[in-house]
Amino acid sequence: MESPIRFENVDINTILKTLPHRFPFLLIDRVRNIREDYSGIGVKNVTFNEPAFQGHFPDRPVFPGVLMIEGMAQTAGVIGIMSVSGTEKPRAVYFLTIDKCKFRKPVLPGDTVEYHMKSIGRRKTMWWFHGDAVVDGKTVAEADVGAMLTD
């Protein structure tokens, strides 16, 4: 059984208040279904106008895998920050680790990537998440990411 939803939809304005990232490095458009088990889904609408497509690759644009991993990390950051309440609320998230990373299928302009993130561990200010990047119901990438929430 899934845990209850704490935040149903985190829009771009809330993300901008939560994360320090800005264009061209803010790589999520919204986060939905943040649950009490520290899971949630980040959403990235990939368009041909992405700056990375100027060089990756001009004649056959493919969304870079490293940017999907960063999108996973940003989604995890929003989940972590919004899940901590009161005076413990962190002001920054530092991306620390990437493990078990696999890229399975290219992501192209017009795709919507969903970053399905779930906490797999927490110790003090350290958090670990497993993430699956999903397009049209198919996993295109996966990784375990670690981060430190701090003030």
UniProtKB/Swiss-Prot annotation:
Name the UniProt record assigns to this protein: 3-hydroxyacyl-[acyl-carrier-protein] dehydratase FabZ
Catalysis: reaction(s): a (3R)-hydroxyacyl-[ACP] = a (2E)-enoyl-[ACP] + H2O
Alphabetical keyword list: Cytoplasm, Lipid A biosynthesis, Lipid biosynthesis, Lipid metabolism, Lyase
Compartments (UniProt record): Cytoplasm
HAMAP family, sorted: FabZ
Pfam family, one: FabA
Family: Belongs to the thioester dehydratase family. FabZ subfamily.
Domain of life: Bacteria
EC number, UniProt record: 4.2.1.59
